[in-house]
Amino acid sequence: MGFLKTCVFRRNACTAVCFWRSQVVQKPSVRKISTTSPRSTVMPAWVIDKYGSNEVLRFTQNMMIPMIHYPNEVIIKVHAASINPIDVNMRSGYGATALNMKRDPLHVKIKGEEFPLTLGRDVSGVVMECGLDVRYFKPGDEVWAAVPPWKQGTLSEFVVVSGNEVSHKPRSLTHTQAASLPYVALTAWSAINKVGGLNDRNCTGKRVLILGASGGVGTFAIQVMKAWDAHVTAVCSQDASELVRKLGADDVIDYKSGNVEAQLKSSKPFDFILDNVGGSTETWALKFLKKWSGATYVTLVTPFLLNMDRLGIADGMLQTGVTVGSKTLKHFWQGVHYRWAFFMASGPCLDDIAELVEAGKIQPVIEKTFPFSKVPEAFLKVERGHARGKTVINVV
């Protein structure tokens, strides 16, 4: 049924990684992992061997099962995963320069050694193995997580993640439902809470505008803003208006029915704007913020990774710094805050999100599910855009 593995860990690494967790579990020093076949050291996975279009996706039965290398890591048996736009972009090589620097800061490896690369950021599954310093989880726990993009992804039978990136799955959700949330939820949480400074204590009555409201990030953002008693205006297409209203949006603007800027002129100013669209949006959106009141515009569409792909690490970071610095200063003098936000993997934040889920304040929004054998079709679905929620992969 399985095999035994004994791992030697770096004793001085991350000894306090789970200080924010209160529950302690006891683990034996040698544990057992159940795999697809007896004595197996390989697993099924979807990988890419080079960057490109959908044809580069390849199914293999021979991907090496991940090993625990640090004492704060856990191995999860993947029950469900999901496809995000970042996965489609990474398949095509987006962000490769910066992500490879994160994978190999000393540039020891030669170019292309990130392959075979497994995509997929979301996971809901069961803990199979725990590092020696993991105290909050034990084998058999049902968990969910979002894996940082520089790590091997979740479109495989097993995935290894840091313990501080993992959270106990909400009991009210199936694995399929749970896999739809972590990446988009943490991205929205980063923008709204960590960067925007909004929370359940200061959000009541705030006027919030969400641009690109019908995708994964937008549908989560609507729900968390309504859970915190904000007034939400959602911008999406007409065919998504019923969805966002069901999620709690107070006002809905159809961007296809006319100029959004013109439609917003009759609205009161906003305290917070979340931009999932980018492009020319920021050239007009900020003027709808309340001036000199602490109002904030946060965009999730930034040139950070593209700059490094195009200019290299040093010049790309310099260009990025100049861009965000100049825009921040420009809008500061106009009485509003301009900010960028990014996905941040965080088990503690997922704990907070799980509480909202269990309280019935957050519902997963799933547009379509695919079996593990249909991963390429799922990528094409996400690549076509116009999402009405998430695309989920049932691995088990």
Curated annotation (Swiss-Prot):
GO terms for cellular component: mitochondrial matrix; mitochondrial outer membrane; mitochondrion. It catalyses: a 3-demethylubiquinone + NADH + 2 H(+) = a 3-demethylubiquinol + NAD(+); a 3-demethylubiquinone + NADPH + 2 H(+) = a 3-demethylubiquinol + NADP(+); 3-demethylubiquinone-10 + NADH + 2 H(+) = 3-demethylubiquinol-10 + NAD(+); 3-demethylubiquinone-10 + NADPH + 2 H(+) = 3-demethylubiquinol-10 + NADP(+). Gene3D superfamilies: Medium-chain alcohol dehydrogenases, catalytic domain, NAD(P)-binding Rossmann-like Domain. It is an enzyme of class 1 (oxidoreductase). GO terms for biological process: nervous system development; regulation of dendrite development; ubiquinone biosynthetic process. Its main location: mitochondrion. GO terms for molecular function: NADPH dehydrogenase (quinone) activity; zinc ion binding. Keywords: Membrane, Mitochondrion, Mitochondrion outer membrane, NADP, Neurogenesis, Nucleotide-binding, Oxidoreductase, Transit peptide, Ubiquinone biosynthesis. Residues 1-40 form a transit peptide. InterPro entries: ADH-like_N, GroES-like_sf, NAD(P)-bd_dom_sf, PKS_ER, Quin_OxRdtase/zeta-crystal_CS, RTN4I1, YIM1/Zinc_Alcohol_DH_Fams. Pathway: Cofactor biosynthesis; ubiquinone biosynthesis. Belongs to the zinc-containing alcohol dehydrogenase family. Quinone oxidoreductase subfamily. NAD(P)H oxidoreductase involved in the ubiquinone biosynthetic pathway. Required for the O-methyltransferase activity of COQ3. Able to catalyze the oxidoreduction of 3-demethylubiquinone into 3-demethylubiquinol in vitro. However, it is unclear if 3-demethylubiquinone constitutes a substrate in vivo. May also play a role in the regulation of retinal ganglion cell (RGC) neurite outgrowth, and hence in the development of the inner retina and optic nerve. Appears to be a potent inhibitor of regeneration following spinal cord injury. This is NAD(P)H oxidoreductase RTN4IP1, mitochondrial.
